């Protein structure tokens, strides 16, 4: 506080002595002592302007007495114009003398905060003089209707515009001894505005009170004054007159703006151009200039809007800082009180009763429980509820799994193709051929593992090891001898000698198996290989039945996926060609001949897959 001084710009401009104070006063704003000289310099040019204006008026009067009558006439006109401008400037200065910038208007005490109210919904087109005229008329009407002789007046006011068409007016009333006059005035103004809003929809002004002011008024409110309809009509007529003046001024301004765009091009400057091109050129010039003026208007409106947003953001920062400082002061005060209470407890522990200690302990426990509750509530909102929502979404997806799977079937098939689930098949088509070639090389080098060495029986007959393994051995057979026999067969080409009982069992099984094979061969009809391949090659369906089966095959998109698998892209024309070939020829060989031209060796694989589909099977 030692580095802060309180100053009043109004008193300084009126050259009064008490414009500076070390303590807070009504209408004074706090500044740093280091900024005092800067404050005086900023207001000094206003005083110099007033002095120069007075000297100009005096000099013009002296010059008027010297010149002749003709010159006096012209000078009188100039003096009248200058005097009129001076009077209008003085009126504006007088009418806006109670207006303060928003930073200077901020209340610095609780009394100023209580006596500050706001009007919302005031048109942004109202000038400062019109706003003060409206405020004075409203205040005089309220004091008259409430029959109050109080010296209540508007001490200062400011405005803040968050939109382009409306603004908020902040009003600070002077503090008077009669609180009843201030309370009755606010109640009457609030009732007056509400009554007019019910009658006229174009009247948007509303009185807004801060929380402290609202409680202050409610505690001191007796009977709410009634509003007479004729008084409301009188105030509304004043409001409409001000609004009409504003509309007239805006219309003149619009006409001036229109005149800046509606102009004629001087064709004399375009004399060197052909006459048939002048009309179009003039239109282009007017259109271009109109476009430029419109862009400038839009930029101006945008800058106005951005300025209002910036002011609003600045106000929000100021209010947040005030709130932060206020809460910080309260927190420091509470901390000091707690420290003081702890010291008092240590000093007066013997004298303080147990009831007060228990009460204080309960309060601390309550604060701790409230803090834990807030932490748990934050945990619920930040972690638990999002997890529950995610689990519910998973449950709903699981309940409708089949429907979801069927709906996105094509996407999943594409995902299987693009994400390379089968790496060797998708990216290495020759992998199967390489494996087959390696298997043949291994068989040529190491022999075929399926063709085991034959087992020589004791009676001179030979049987393969596979058949010998399939024979069920009788009970009592020596396992060790069988193990040695198998070992000898796998490791060397020596003949294995088997016991007589084992020989009998093997001979009996060989005879029975040969009889079964002969019986099966006798039952099967003789079929030529050419007839069998021809039957497999042709489709045994009628034309209508084949069309139905081809339609089902087309709807399953199996042929599309085959083409996509071997070509890498979808080809609808190729799919139609394949289906048409099957419909016309009904032959696997004819289809294979056509596919080899496009797919080479893969054509045989495609034909085999198509002929193995259920659509081409009998009984399906």
From Swiss-Prot:
Component of the U1 snRNP particle, a subcomplex of the spliceosome. Its main location: cytoplasm. This is U1 small nuclear ribonucleoprotein component SNU71. Residues 58-82, 246-270, 323-373, 428-452, 509-537 are annotated as: Disordered. Residues 246-256, 356-373, 431-445, 517-537 have a biased composition (Basic and acidic residues). The modification Phosphoserine is found at residues 512, 514. GO terms for cellular component: cytoplasm; spliceosomal complex. Residues 296-385 form a coiled coil. InterPro entries: PWI_dom. The keyword Phosphoprotein applies. Component of the U1 snRNP particle, which recognizes and binds the 5'-splice site of pre-mRNA. Together with other non-snRNP factors, U1 snRNP forms the spliceosomal commitment complex, that targets pre-mRNA to the splicing pathway. It holds the Pfam family SNU71_N. GO terms for molecular function: RNA binding. One of its GO terms (biological process) is mRNA processing. Belongs to the SNU71 family. It is found in: Cytoplasm; Nucleus. Residues 66-75, 258-270 have a biased composition (Polar residues).
